[in-house]
């Protein structure tokens, strides 16, 4: 009987550890310093004091394209209240593909281009879009994999602002 209890407790610990590991990175958000299409460097470290939404996406990704209008609305609504959004494109075609898409979609928040090394720093990304919410102290507060509505995003960031 006692052995069954020990096995049960150990099983719960294993499940808890597995779930914690599956969440992706926690703690301090990995820094990046990447240029936007105008050549301005966007550095995560310099955004401390703001809630930062870091969104990994690509122009060819349908769910990514669908969530962008809501991200634009959130940015316009909350940028004066301490919200920053940084879109990190994972398009292999680089600015040649991304810049026309930014213009066509009228994206108002900063867009930069990431690479495999940055993806690795964020714990590897299994799907896009993947969004990290970084609190005012620079720590990853939340992570969301997949499409997100404006309302979903608002729920993730509002309490942190």
Located regions from the model:
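Thiol/disulfide oxidoreductase modules built on the thioredoxin-like
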Residues: 100-108, 113-158
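Bacterial N-terminal signal peptides that target proteins for export
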Residues: 1-10
């Amino acid at each position: 009987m006692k052995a069954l209890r020990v096995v049960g407790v150990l099983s719960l610990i294993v499940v808890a550890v597995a779930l914690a590991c599956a969440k992706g990175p926690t703690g301090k958000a990995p820094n990046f310093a990447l240029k936007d299409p105008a050549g301005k460097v966007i550095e995560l470290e310099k955004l401390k004091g703001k809630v930062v939404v870091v969104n990994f996406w690509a122009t060819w990704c349908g769910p990514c394209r669908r969530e962008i209008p809501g991200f634009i609305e959130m940015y316009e609504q909350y940028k004066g209240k301490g919200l920053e959004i940084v879109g990190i494109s994972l398009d292999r075609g680089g600015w040649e593909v991304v810049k026309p898409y930014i213009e066509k979609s009228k994206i108002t928040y900063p867009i930069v281009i990431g690479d495999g090394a940055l993806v690795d720093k964020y714990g590897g990304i299994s799907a896009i879009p993947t969004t990290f919410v970084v609190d005012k102290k620079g720590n990853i507060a939340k992570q969301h994999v997949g499409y997100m509505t404006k309302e979903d995003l608002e729920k993730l960031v509002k309490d942190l602002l």
